[in-house]
Every structure is written in structure tokens, then in C-alpha cells.
Design a protein with these regions (language model features):
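Basic, Lys/Arg- and aromatic-enriched nucleic-acid-binding interface segment
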Residues: 17-50
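Residue-level marker of regulatory loop/turn positions in helix-turn-helix DNA-binding domains and
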Residues: 12, 31-32, 42, 125, ...
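Short, basic (Lys/Arg/His-rich) helix/loop patches that form interaction surfaces
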Residues: 106, 130-174, 181, 193
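Basic, alpha-helical nucleic-acid-contacting "clamp/cap" segments
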Residues: 64-120, 131-140
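Short, charged phosphate-coordinating catalytic segments
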Residues: 43-67, 170-174
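Flexible interdomain linker/hinge and immediately adjacent N-terminus
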Residues: 1-25, 75, 114-120
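Mobile genetic element proteins and their domesticated derivatives, centered on retroelements
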Residues: 23, 39, 47, 73, ...
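Short, leucine-enriched amphipathic alpha-helices that occur as contiguous helical runs
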Residues: 20, 35-37, 126, 130, ...
Length: 193
């Protein structure tokens, strides 16, 4: 719609490492707290879209060719044939995923819904990610002028952090799964030099 009427699409609020650390400081060892920590770390480290995050299963956790922790992305918006891709993750996230697996004592989807009684449901719906991020942001009691976080906040924030660290555009594109320079640059457009 924005393209049709000549307006730029609004940029998602970046969930940068700094904001990630603030949000993580509010995650406790409760069922919800641990699930939220998994969501935050998995979203930031993998730079995946909401639907892709919700599709990860425990069986997708693996070791990369270099023997380091990784997770397999089986299908994505830019991989419609399901060729798959191995995404590196930190040892910290790998250990957290194992802790989460033991806590919910189940296989299947990693990100799960949790009802008000603390019962673990099936896989989390992609729309729930934005709702959870907004709630986590509200719990921080950050400035009300701050735009709410959304599902794309992981991708924007992590891409901006990589750029700040001096990573070349090609490497950022590989991490984020962008196939064209223009797509990646669109996520980096609010970068201030």
C-alpha cells in the first residue's frame, strides 16, 4: 500500500544488543521468563522472521560443519523449496535451548504458548511474537515515545549491530537471508554514521 501511494514503509523499531540486554534482565527463571529469554535470544541471533521463529523445532538444533552449535532453518520466505540452511547460534543459546527442553520435557516446537494457568500449549503463533515483544517492552517502562517492538525488530536491530561492528554488507545479507542489496539496505536505512 505504501508503495502505491508513494510513501516509504515505516521502519521497525530496532531491537539492538543494548535493548536486548535490557529486555533479558527482566526475564526470570519462571516458565514464561525462560520462554521469553529463548524468544529474545533466538530471534536476535538468527535474524529470522516471525513465522520462521515459530517453525523451529528442538530436532532442528544441531552442530554446524565446524562443530559449533547451530540450528537448521528448514523453510523460509526466500527458500520456498525447503532447501534449508544451517544458522550458527551461540553456546549460551544452545545451553538455554537444552534447559528449556528439559523444563518443558517435550519435543516438537521450541516456541510455545503458555496460558494464564501456566500450561504449555502448542507452538506459538507468529502474531504472538509482536504481542510478547510489546509486553516485554512495556515491562521495561521505557519512554512512551518509543515505537513498539515488532516481529521485524530482531532483523533490524541485529543487522544494525552487525553494521556497527564493521561487518560487510554481504555477510549481513547472508545472516539475514536477504538475496538483494536493496532488501538488506532497506533494513539498514536508519543507520546513523
Amino acid at each position: 500500500m505504501h508503495r502505491k501511494i508513494g510513501r516509504a514503509q515505516p521502519q521497525a523499531t530496532p531491537l539492538t544488543k543494548q535493548l536486548l540486554n535490557q529486555l533479558l534482565s527482566n526475564c526470570d527463571n519462571s516458565l514464561r521468563g525462560l520462554r521469553n529469554e529463548v524468544l529474545l535470544r533466538l530471534g536476535y541471533e538468527t535474524m529470522r522472521r516471525r513465522s520462521e521463529l515459530c517453525a523451529f523445532k528442538f530436532e532442528d538444533i544441531c552442530k554446524g560443519a565446524n562443530g559449533k552449535p547451530a540450528i537448521r532453518l528448514n523453510f523460509s520466505k526466500t527458500d520456498q523449496f525447503g532447501t534449508g540452511k544451517i544458522l550458527p547460534i551461540s553456546q549460551e543459546l544452545f545451553d538455554l535451548l537444552e534447559k528449556w527442553r528439559r523444563m518443558i520435557s517435550d519435543e516438537g516446537y521450541i516456541l510455545r504458548s503458555i496460558n494464564r494457568h501456566g500450561h504449555i500449549g502448542s507452538n506459538l503463533h507468529p502474531a504472538s511474537i509482536s504481542i510478547l515483544l510489546k509486553a516485554l517492552q512495556k515491562d521495561l517502562k521505557v519512554d512512551s515515545d518509543e515505537k513498539p517492538l515488532s516481529g521485524h525488530s530482531f532483523r533490524v536491530g541485529a543487522a544494525l549491530d552487525l553494521l556497527e561492528q564493521g561487518e560487510p554488507l554481504e555477510r549481513i545479507m547472508l545472516r539475514g537471508g536477504w538475496q538483494t542489496d536493496s532488501s538488506a539496505i532497506n533494513y539498514l536505512r536508519n543507520w546513523s554514521m
